[in-house]
Amino acid sequence: MRLVGAVTQGSGAINEDGLGYLGNAEDVSAAWIFDGVTGINGQNFLGGGSDAAWLVAKAHDHLKALASLDLPLREILSKLVQTLIADFKTATKDLDLPEDYDPPAACLTIVKRYRETWQALRLGDSCLLARGGDGAHLSVAASPNNAFDHWLSAEALKRRDAGMLDVKELLAEFRPQLMQGRKLRNSPSGYGILEASPSATEFAEYFDLGTPREILLCTDGYFRAVDYYGLHSEQSLLEASLASGGVDSVLDSIHSVEASDPACVKYLRFKPADDATAVALRKRV
């Protein structure tokens, strides 16, 4: 696969997203994206700007070595989680974490070539769109539009109407509900996510991509172009991202919409903007 475009931008001072790939731009053998989960602890404990950014940086560094191994994605994930557990233990050994500490987590999507075919792994709600070798479009894993997110966005809008505009204040108010939702991480009744816990290996999704012609990995901040703002369908997002300068152009269009609706009234959402990341790949010819 050839790297057509890659972009990652934070919505604020700290970008909790991340991306990486193996090989060079003309011959990519694996690629991945991260979407760090916004912390609700009231302060950061682990350095790196935020606890989520710390986890993303550690996981990215480990993946640069692990993704090159001739191992199934399931085993690569297992080794990644083991290293993160060791990292977290070292980082917190002298810290007095609160009893209700919300540990760092991140969405992870990775694709890897195995001889002539490609496999994929997903933890969390980032997106993986692909077009098969026959030209047929395949939405392997799109970002879910879940009921809790809609409820949270609606409640946040009420607070903004009353003059509460700071996201940190909103996070503090809704912390009990967010904590309850995060207790469902990596559980049968919840959702999979990357964290420094053995359970993170149990709830990943795996996909056989066959011999795709094109692949787009993107976080939900980038996929807002589809499910929030209606700028694209899944197929047109894939096509636009694969154009020359496409990922930057798509991100510019997202920023334009967000700048025109800072109070989140026209497009209901919890935060005015989100970190956004995308990697676009096309089969070499």
Region spans (language model):
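PP2C/PPM-type serine/threonine phosphatase catalytic domain
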Residues: M1-V285
